[in-house]
């Protein structure tokens, strides 16, 4: 071993005094303490020394290694603290700078209305059921007693993905799925998005929202349906609201009716909104058709039921006197902020 250990220590002290940052410190550590470093190589050469000098040289090398490690550790702490302080200064927040106003979001008006409608029916013992928006023709049409030649199946009215797959045109398929998977009594509402091939205008949109209801049990009558919808109308539109049923036709209910409420703007006296009639249509309803019950393996001689369906957008338009359905979808904050 030809290197003088005492001189090597002086050399180390001189070099480490010139180390200015963590990168240079890493290079210094590798040079002296790395696998191929100076100290490591000197330790390997100890075996070449005479036995009477080997112990002393080994002790001196260990002391040198410990000294270098202590110097490295002290410098590392120093440099890390310096970098930390630099980072703190760089990221420092000036609390005297005026803050930026954070815009607080709110629930969309359609979500508010859907929730309000749902909560009324939930309070009457209904449960919420959901289903896929991409639906099979069977659940959307066939099981609901809508034959192949029915106008509703026209490609001009329905978004078909393939011959038997489509975007649901109503949330009624949820009712079929529930009736096929559950035995009566069944008492559900099914809110959700639906799709129809309509031109966009003030009252139509190809995507809109519905809430449909279904109650199936023994002894359910039209009187139960009328009472249920009267409760809903009075709670949602006000206690003075009156309800009337007009005969109509739906393939999935028999008898069927369109349901009107007394005009909430003129009290039934006649105005521009109700076109002078004093009544405004809000939904369709009826007794579940025997064939629909049979399609779901429910005995129509033992069970009866009623169903109803309403458009959330239509209800919102009426309640808030909004004239154009497109306002719901344009994300204009000037409009949406009115319903916080």
Curated annotation (Swiss-Prot):
Keywords: Aminoacyl-tRNA synthetase, ATP-binding, Cytoplasm, Ligase, Magnesium, Metal-binding, Nucleotide-binding, Protein biosynthesis. Binds 2 magnesium ions per tetramer. It is found in: Cytoplasm. Tetramer of two alpha and two beta subunits. PROSITE patterns: AA_TRNA_LIGASE_II. This is Phenylalanine--tRNA ligase alpha subunit. It comes from Caldicellulosiruptor saccharolyticus (strain ATCC 43494 / DSM 8903 / Tp8T 6331). The gene is pheS. Its cofactor is Mg(2+).
